[in-house]
């Protein structure tokens, strides 16, 4: 595993930790934004099985469906709408990059342009 000058792994996932101990189990309470399943369904239909950022096909799931992830371009937590004008279907790589990547702002800007064009059709 590649280690940087601070002693951290160069590679991370959503569960990254600097400690090498087994995780402890604990109960978590919180709030979640309610999402409209009709928006998700319409966005996935619009994408027709292709990432709306890179146009690559989603992968096939065990039950034969095409997998993409729906992404709120302007997050709900930042007053973004749960509407097809603000939601894109992305491959898992670009969905994670849109949240955690160095290019997240560029991806957001490109997705906003793409969604605007699709609304004009």
What is each residue range found by the language model?
Residues 43, 72, 91, 95:
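Divalent metal-coordination and catalytic microenvironments
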């Amino acid at each position: 595993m590649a280690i940087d000058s601070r002693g951290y792994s160069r590679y991370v996932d959503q569960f990254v930790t600097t400690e090498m101990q087994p995780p402890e189990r604990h109960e978590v309470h919180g709030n979640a934004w309610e999402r409209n399943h009709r928006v998700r369904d319409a966005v996935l239909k619009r994408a027709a099985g292709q990432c709306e950022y890179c146009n690559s096909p989603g992968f096939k799931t065990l039950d034969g469906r095409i997998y993409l992830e729906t992404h709120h371009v302007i997050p709900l937590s930042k007053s973004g709408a749960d509407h097809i004008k603000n939601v894109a279907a992305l491959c898992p790589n670009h969905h994670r990059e849109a949240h955690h990547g160095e290019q997240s702002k560029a991806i957001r800007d490109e997705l906003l342009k793409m969604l605007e064009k699709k609304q004009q059709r």
